[in-house]
UniProtKB/Swiss-Prot annotation:
The lineage of its organism: Eukaryota, Fungi, Dikarya, Ascomycota, Pezizomycotina. One of its GO terms (cellular component) is membrane. Disulfide bonds: none annotated. GO terms for molecular function: snoRNA binding. This is U3 small nucleolar RNA-associated protein 10. The keyword Transmembrane applies. The chain crosses the membrane at residues 942-962, 998-1018. Belongs to the HEATR1/UTP10 family. Keywords: Membrane, Nucleus, Repeat, Ribonucleoprotein, Ribosome biogenesis, rRNA processing, Transmembrane, Transmembrane helix. It comes from Neosartorya fischeri (strain ATCC 1020 / DSM 3700 / CBS 544.65 / FGSC A1164 / JCM 1740 / NRRL 181 / WB 181) (Aspergillus fischerianus). It is found in: Nucleus, Nucleolus; Membrane.
Amino acid sequence: MASSLAAQLSQIAAKSTNQLDLKAQRTAHSQSLIFDRKVASTQDFDTVYQICYEGFQELCQLDSRFTAFERTIFSEQSKAEDRTQLTAAQNKELDVALEAFLALVGGRLLLNPAVKAVEWLVRRFRIHEYNTSFTILTFLPYYTTPLFLNLLAILPEDLTPTFKVLIPYKKGSINPPRHPLVHSATTNKPFLAALNSYVLQVSRQQAHHHALLAFWAGIYTEAVAGMLDASRSGRREVEKQKHEDIVIRVLPILNDGFAMKNVSELVIGCYMVSVVLAQKASLQDKVLDGLMEAVAGSWTEETIESGLVCLAVLAQQKPETKLPRRALKAILRLDDVLKRLTEIATQYKTSHLLLGVVAGCLDDLPRQKDTARLDLLSRIFQNQLLGEPEMSKAMTLVLEATSSVHKDGAMSLDAQARLADLVQVFSQSESLQPTFQKTIAESSFDIAALEHNLQTVIDTAPAPRTVEDVEMEDVEKEEEQDNFSSAVESLSGEKLFKGSFLSTQSIPLFERLAQAFTLAVGSNEKCQTFSDLAALGKSEATKSPQYLSFFIRVFSGPYPMGTRATALNMITSFLTSTENTNLDFQALLPFLLVALTDASERVRREAAAALAAVGSLYKKNKKGEDVWARSNLYGQLKDIKWLPTRDAQKIFERAVLPSLEECIIDAAHIGRVLENTLRGVSVDANASELKKPLRLAFFTFLCSNAIELPLFTPKLGLLNILNRIDKAGGTTRTKELEPLLKTWRGFSEREVQDICEKERVPVSDVERQMVTIVTPKEKDAIMILLSNVSPHSESLRPSFIAAVFGRIKGIWARVAEDRQVVAAEQLFEISLGVSNLPLVNNCRDLLRSVQLPGSVLAQFLERIPVSLTDMEALGPAPKRRRTSQNNMIAMTVKDEAEFGKVMEKMTFILELVDSSSPETHPELADGLFQALAALHHFKSQIQSGMSYLLSLTLGSLLAIVNRSKESAKAQFDTSVIRADLVVDCVRTTESPQVQNAALLLVAGLSVIAPELVLHSVMPIFTFMGSSVLRKDDEYSVSVIDQTIDQVVPALIQSLRDQKRDVVSGTSELLLSFTAAFEHIPSHRRLRLFHALITKLGTQDFLFAVLAMLANRYAMDKDVLVLMTGLVSDASAPVELTTYSKFLGLVSDSLKPKPGISQVLLGIGSDDGREPQKVAVDLLRDLAYLFKHSSLKVKMAKTFASEDEEAIRQLRTIFSQILEQVLTIGDSVQSMKLVSQANGDVLAALFGTLTLVDFLDTIEVLLERPNDELRRKVLRLLEGRLRQNPERDSASQIRVLDFLPTLVDIIRNSADILLKHAAVACIDRIAEKYGKKDPSRVVSAAQVVASEACIGQTDDRIRIMGVLCLASMAETLGQVMIPALPEALSRSLALLELSLEEGKENSRLHDAVFSLFSALFVHIPYMISGPHLDKILLLSFKSANAEDCEDDSRQEALKMMARKVDMAATLGAVDRNWQYAVQAGPVATKETLEVVSLAVEKHPKSATGKNIGVLSSILFKAFDLRREQLALGANATFDAADVDEIEDALNDVTIKMIYKLNDTTFRPIFTKMLDWATSGLPKKDTQGSWARLTTFYKFLQVFFGTLQSIVTGYASYIIESVVSVLGKASPADKSTKALWLATMRLLRNAFEHDQDGMPVLPINPCLKLTITEFWQSPSHLNQISTPLINQLAHATNSSTAATVIAEAVPAITELAVAADSTDNHKELNTALMKFLRPSAGPNGKPAGGENPHTRLAALKAEQSLTEQLGEEWLALLPEMLPYISELMEDEDENVEREVRKWVKQIENVLGEKLDDMLT
């Protein structure tokens, strides 16, 4: 009971929100999405609200739905809301608002405003604690983002099992990957349920978003798939049960999802899940049907495609092909269903779905109201969407439906006809026939029954009938008999129909009769029964039209083939059996002729039989003229042009009957027969021609029937025949049939649709045949057609208008040109009407699509100037226009409307011209130029661009000009050309299209009429430069290329013809292009300028282009790249010639009266630049070209060839250029910048030469008296040698041969700068070529070391000379020895000079040390001791000089230490140590560095040999501390300097020890000990302490570095150390350093006493015997007490800190080294004396009177406990009394530390000391 109560109380405490628990409140308040905990904890709710409300306001601007929350969770009152104070109902209401907001904000969580807003929900309402599930699900789609990581950090630790998947990622502070979430959804039902519920809730709220639905769809689909996979089982029943359970869980979610049609992504996600279910679960048909209906009922326009894919997948899983009714209806309602299914079929299997659609189309055929489904069925087969097996199944479905259709009732005639046509397609199509034949062969269909049902013939062998088939057929016949009997019975009461069945379209009785006749077809008995019906009046058939007109209408109508053939057979039977042979049955002729064109051979055969029967009656006719149904065939008062009987007989006998056999075979034959008959040409050898009157009569007879016939199926067939005949017997088809056309025109669209639907003829076919009535041979054919649409177009059907214009278009080419002109005028006038009328649009389309003659186009063009003149007449008076701004025409609203019409008219005309292949009509050039003039004038008046019109005009002109260019002579009168207008188009328009067209036109005109164009051409190039050249499209590039290709050559030729200077004459052109450079796309610049220069002539114009570019852009990088590219394309002679002309231009620009430079560069003009600035830019660019072009390579290639003429030419031009450069140099010496630039050119020019040629040229130039020139060429040589000079043998020899010239300059020249340049050249030569022949360089070295060079007073020559000697030393090595004496003496003197006070020269100083470095490296043995002494002394002086750099000096000293003999180096150091110390810390450190390097870099043997001098140096250095101390205030080293130097000294000593063995080192050690302990008088206490300090510091390093192998050396120092411990104190400044050194020395000595371990000596030579040194009682007893007594120095906080830091570690290490219980007990006994403040047991003071001493002792105990652990605590019984006393100590620090020690002991022992201490 108690435990249960405790558990309840703990739960209550865990959930408690006690307001007094401030810590918990602060923790909760610091939970934040965007702020760090520390920051969040400092924020109040006002601050948080202000930040979050800003985000909320931004959200409201994004979506107004957020504003609803402004009154609730984001109100001012919300700041005071505390969930812990709200009631349960209030919290529930709050949860609703919070969840609604979270749902809405979920889609925007990656936006800062949304995160700020949610922050308020976290901080104020703590949604992460109270609405955890909803919050997690809101953030879950963003599980990969840092935001989700922030949420994880603030979620409660005790997450529910629903979200247990997140727990490890919350603990690890990492984002969860996708896989665990999918796995959780698969295995954790609550998680998946929560996710589904959340998604549906958000979607119902219309707050769904892509991130959520995409996440959910992916997770849910994978989860369902995973669940189904996991439920696989070897036992089918178990697996089925598990699958059913999963389906039961999933279907409600899908049902809810499908219900939300407007949430398209949710619906698509449900489709995905449905697909997974269908593919992975064995679903029952019921479930599949339900899913399919749900899918079909859920789709919208957005989801149709996905829905169809889903249906296709579901259908594939169905064993049956039948689709559920709702799904089928949804599919059939779709627009373009076949197109959609075709697109899907490329990626998914759709065969079952298509078979289901096929089955649905065939379902319940008798009850189908229309043929829409059968139409779809036909299209499925036509598009062949099914594979062969599925196609066979589909055909089987069609045949099954046809076979069983009578069971459900009679099929409509339309449906029967459609199915019959479809089966005919099966049997006749090349692609479908094999499959159909196979289907028939493999099935047991009764072909005869199928043919009977469809009233058609199936072209296949009937399968053998089985007994069962026969029985079935009997049953079917019985059922058919019942249907026929009932039909006949219903008609038996009908009286004779009053008129002809052809009199009107809609006759209900006829429909009933036709249905009954269809049932009778196939049975003679039934047909006989049917023909005896009273309604048909068979007995009165010769007198009244009912009987025959019925069968005429049937065989002429849209009925199955069998029905039509039987109807014809009935007529034939009647004709052959009639007794009245005097009747004229010519009324049958039009219908029978149409029947002969039927696609079915059977129908044609029956029609031929009927015609033969009529023909036989004519033969029997003796009386004639009694025409059957003459007055009432089509009703009363029909104007039929009946034929006289004998004429009819002639037609039959001469035209029709002879061709019947051919007509049976070929359906098109009768058309040819009638065409030839009516034209008077016989096609049959047995037939004879008809005379013209008879042909006329026959033609008018047929035409009148076509006009009067009310039925459109036979009318259409008759028209199809008649429309082959243009004329017959003096009349035309148009004349005869025009009434029919007018009648047809009068029908409304509804009437036409009704007519065509009833008779199943396409409207388009009828429209086309009607307008085909008008023949092109009719003189006014086009006008007749236009007359049928023009006056009353608004009331006409659009389809009729389209047909009329289609006919006009079709016959246009066959109409005479004069009639075309008239028609075109008419069409044009109509085209100017209201543009939205169908008639106007059709007229315009027609004019655009037909080939208009040139005369028509010319007339149209003449209208443009007239129209614009009329338009100007609408403007204000000329005076007012002149005074108005820009002469603009002011227009009223009415004027604007008129202006719009004029513009539309001009646009249409120019579009017609443009689309009529204007190149084939050169006569249009005049009109087009006039139109261009008018447009240009009008454009300037109205300030409008009119770009489109100009573009059309220019385009047409361009086409004409381009065609004209192909012929030798212009194809039009060139006097009409207006080049000025074309140029103005280029200049004044902003349209790129107009500009390009105008440029191309100028280019073309310059070819065919250059004299008319070139005077206007320059403005074009000016404009091109500012506009066209900057364009980067391919067309503009082509335009520019053509303009350059065609205009420039013509321009140059014109200038030459006029004997003008071509360069100055084209300056404007060049200026245009150079000015445009910066606007031309970078990748096109080179190609464009190259094309321009090539067309102009590279040799003549390249220099000008280069100069203009240089003048305008100076050293612009892009320009330089272009210039380099241009010159690199030229040959070497051309490039050099260009440079020569370029230099000539520079010279010209600097003249008082410039010539061509004024034209090209603007020198001397008002807006021109200063000549000097121009010259500088040109020369700098030229220097760049010399350096970076390929001239050097090209010249070398030429010189390497054997072409003497080419070589001579190059040398001549090069010499000329060199002379030009030198001449310019002489003339511009006073112009500093120009002179410098000219020098750069000279340098670059020389750079094009080989080194040998260069030196040859230099030798000549050095003979000139001009020192500036001589200096310049030597500097050029130095620069050339500094880079990568040639290394070939010839070059090397030539360079060395040049050395005497340079030596001579140094010896004899008074020009210091010239000498300097010569030395620099020698330096380069020695470095690059000295090793080739060192002996030739030595003489130069001697001169450099002489008075003539480094012996001069000028520092520049001195520095250069010393550096040169350094280079020579590196190159020549020992060969340089002859020059060494003088070089050393002078260089040392120069170094000393550079260090004199007030004359410091750092550059000279560095140069000398560089020389010494080189000498030390290459010939160290030549540096004597006195030289080394001098070098060291000067280096000491340099170390103290402020203006000197340290690097060169230090480098030289390092080289001395490394390379010079060790004895010489150490001897020099030993001799000069005192001077180093006098120089100060820096010099001393550097000297020690020399010693260190010498020891380190030389072998051990050298160290051993020089141990005496080395020891001398070390003892002098060790005494530095004492010496400085003795100097007192005069000391030059402070304590830090001494410490630093001693550290370096210790390092040197250790390095020395490494190279010694024990035998060698031990005496030195003992000598050091003696030196430190007894080397001074006893009175010199301070000196002794100083030496001991230095020595002990060394020992500290000694023991610390060499460790256990030198522990034995401690025996030498114990006595000294004990002595020091008794005297030195950390409290005494004079001995503190010594005391510290002692402590550290002992610590290192104790620390590395590693007894028992195998030890490898660092130096194999230093073999020392290792013993258990500090464990020995003699050693331990000697040192332990003095060491522990050091604790007594802890008398105040300062000394206590020092003792604890230094003495305690030493004591600890001693205890570790002692390593035995007895030793530890002895140490502890000594130590505990300092723990007791009172007197000991014997009454003597214990030593711990001072609390600081006790504290230090406690620290020692703590350290020992920590280091030794239980080993030390074996002495605990002895310690316990002391601990008890110390726990009662008066000093708080002591008491605190003893308690720490107690805890430390307890931790080691694992038990409490309480019992032991009591």
